Regions:
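Conserved glycine-rich cofactor-binding loop
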Residues: 7, 12-16
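Substrate-binding pocket helix/loop in short-chain dehydrogenase/reductase
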Residues: 69, 97-99, 103-111, 216
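Short, small/polar-rich loop/turn modules that mediate ligand/substrate recognition or access, typified
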Residues: 174, 179, 246-248
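Alpha-helical segment proximal to the catalytic Tyr-Lys
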Residues: 127, 171-172, 244
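Short C-terminal tail/terminal secondary-structure segment
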Residues: 93-96, 235-236, 247-260
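Residue(s) in the substrate-gating loop at a strand-loop-helix junction
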Residues: 142
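Active-site helix of classical SDR
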Residues: 122, 158, 166
Length: 260
């Protein structure tokens, strides 16, 4: 097993990419601690993991709040004793509006859940990782960090900031046995967020949702979106010893949508 007895804390793990990572990591031997806003979703994922013979714990949280970040991390350590792998995946796209119409409070909310939460949880995880001379932090960024789209300023800024944070922590942590990397997924078309975003963008562009999706997918070399499991498999690689020499990298898993 690639992650045997490596405790993983995965944010945003009630659905989509987070759920896929949690189930795959557990199958590879990791006790996983789940967190997201909706306790019902977390409980369902935990039951699926335990039914397959894995170990799981969970706590619902609003990671725009520093106190909730601290509470979730403490709960993971209380249940499993430590955090070996931190995956910062929680996300919220925010309003699909131009900059001049973007509400400041919504901008702050998106920045906080993507960027500040990742900073706070990394700050909490690093001392223990340093003491063990071992650990992995994986940040789930986005294609939006590299290829800007209109009407998503907070999301693009937060995801780009997450890449900067990845590189800084990687530079600080590498000599202490801790690896930090990021994944930039392309459109995961099966997720609720992708579908809702696509419908909203279609209205902005004055086209049907089907036309919007077709046009977007045509810009990708593979001509399709990605699945949550494809992102999870890349995450498994980056969180395992198979990627032991990879530090401070941002890996595109996007079907050929971007080349940098």
């Amino acid at each position: 097993m690639l992650l045997e007895n490596k405790v993983a804390l995965i944010t945003g793990s009630g659905r989509g990419i987070g759920r896929a990572m949690a189930k795959l990591f557990a199958k590879e031997g990791a006790p996983v601690f789940l967190t997201a806003r909706t306790e019902k979703e977390l409980g369902a994922v935990a039951k699926e993991i335990e039914a397959d013979g894995g170990k799981a714990g969970f706590a619902s949280a609003d990671l725009t709040r520093v106190a909730d970040c601290e509470r979730v991390f403490a709960a993971a350590v209380k249940q499993f004793g430590r955090v070996d792998i931190l995956v910062n995946n929680a996300g919220h796209y925010g309003p699909v509006v131009p900059v001049e119409e973007y509400p400041l409070e919504e901008f702050e909310k998106v920045i906080n859940v993507h960027l500040r939460a990742a900073f706070v949880l990394s700050k909490l995880a690093l001392p223990g990782m340093y003491s063990r001379k071992s650990g992995v932090i994986l940040n789930i960024s986005s294609l939006s960090a590299k290829s800007a789209f209109g009407w998503g300023s907070a999301y693009a800024a937060a995801k780009a900031g997450l890449l900067g944070l990845t590189r800084v922590i990687a530079a600080e942590a590498a000599r202490n046995g801790v690896r930090v990397n990021a994944i930039c997924p392309g459109p995961v078309t099966e997720t609720v967020m992708s579908k809702e975003l696509g419908n909203t963008l279609a209205k902005r562009l004055n086209v049907s949702p089907e036309e919007q999706l077709k046009g977007f997918l045509n810009s990708i070399l593979q001509g399709r979106g990605q699945t949550a499991m494809e992102i999870a498999q890349a995450a498994l690689f980056l969180c395992s010893d198979l990627s032991s020499a990879m530090v401070g990298q941002s890996i595109n898993v996007d079907g050929g949508a971007a080349f940098f």
